[in-house]
Design a protein with these regions (language model features):
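Histidine-/acidic-rich catalytic cores in large beta-rich domains
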Residues: 1-193
């Protein structure tokens, strides 16, 4: 079922939104937690999505466990990034997103390099899933179409789309293998008015 939570203030945190909790459905006991601020430092970026704020810095909106790789894929809308962590250790495996604003050591170690044309990064994504072949599919909200304020798209030029990426985890490359389009033109682009 659907569960809508209310954010609450905690003594040492602004909200409860930046922690993933694994719960035993039989007993209700907490089995494991992953604190996003330990995986991805809160202040490691110089640019965030246009919708981010100090109290809503990650905005997790999808969690996907991949049994083949024993990893968890998380969608951080306000990071404009999809991250993947090792299930057992919580170590960061990779980051899918535009590298602008990230420290160079993160870009070199965790980000993918595009090798296909056309190619577009996603912005403020939702509905991230890992396909059986390892591809990553998502709904790209397309807000601002950039992480850099000076390059933000005007509202009339922003669009949303479905997109599928093929990632090579070893070579650290990424290809855009599907975009919701017909005859070379997007046919399901939701424009902001």
């Amino acid at each position: 079922g659907l569960y809508q939570h209310k954010n609450c203030k905690l003594p040492d945190r602004d909200t409860v939104e930046d922690v993933l909790v694994l719960v035993d459905r039989q007993t209700g006991a907490i089995v494991r937690t992953w604190d996003y601020r330990e995986i991805l430092p809160y202040d490691c970026q110089t640019t965030w999505s246009g919708s981010a704020s100090a109290h809503d810095w990650f905005h997790n909106n999808a969690v996907w466990y991949d049994k083949k790789t024993d990893s968890i894929t998380l969608s951080g809308r306000h990071q404009d990034a999809v991250i993947n962590i090792d299930f057992k250790t919580g170590a960061l495996n990779w980051i899918l997103g535009a590298p602008e604003g990230w420290p160079e050591e993160y870009v070199e170690k965790y980000f993918f390099r595009p090798i296909s044309e056309p190619f577009e990064w996603s912005y403020e994504q939702h509905g991230v899933v890992v396909c059986p072949d390892g591809d990553i599919m998502m709904f790209d909200n397309g807000h601002y179409r950039s992480k850099v304020k000076a390059h933000y798209s005007k509202a009339k030029d922003s669009y949303s789309r479905g997109v599928r990426y093929h990632i090579d985890r070893e070579a650290r490359t990424i290809e855009q293998v599907m975009r919701d389009e017909q005859d070379g033109e997007p046919h399901l682009l939701l424009r902001r008015l």
